[in-house]
Regions:
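Short aromatic/basic micro-patch
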Residues: 3-6, 109
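A contiguous, well-structured "functional interface" segment within a domain
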Residues: 1-4, 15
């Protein structure tokens, strides 16, 4: 195995690579260490950021989504094919209905940002108008 450096996402704020006042979409693709990455990015996620990560279809416990709901201030959002909208997840049971295939990943979003929540609401409004 090759050793790879680990960088805490919030360190990008400390070294000036990211502005604390910026608006960010953070795509996590970290194959099994999503919770650790979310912990490492906690400071960045407090600002105008939205997190995009994959909820694996074979994870019937919804581990990443459960962590976001129970241990972070983030609102959890998922695309619901039944309503054709991005829905705020308040109970994990909606994921039981949405995650129908065990070999597919399902995107979930987490944000505490009014900026991103407004954009998601606008997307849903545009879908209703179609």
């Amino acid at each position: 195995f090759e050793k790879l450096p680990v960088i805490v996402v919030s360190a990008f704020l400390d070294d000036g690579k990211l502005s604390a006042g910026g608006k960010y979409l953070i795509k996590l693709d970290v194959e099994g260490v999503e919770i650790e990455a979310i912990k490492g990015g906690a400071r960045l996620l407090q600002g105008d950021s939205v997190l995009l990560c994959e909820e694996h279809g074979n994870d019937r416990h919804h581990t990443v989504s459960r962590y976001i709901l129970e241990h972070t201030p983030l609102k959890l959002i998922v695309y619901d094919p039944r309503s054709n909208r991005l829905e705020t997840v308040t109970e994990l049971s909606i994921l039981d209905r949405i995650k129908v295939s065990t070999h597919v990943g399902y995107n979930v979003f987490g944000t505490a940002s009014a900026f991103w929540q407004d954009r998601i609401s606008a997307l849903n409004a545009a879908r209703r108008a179609q």
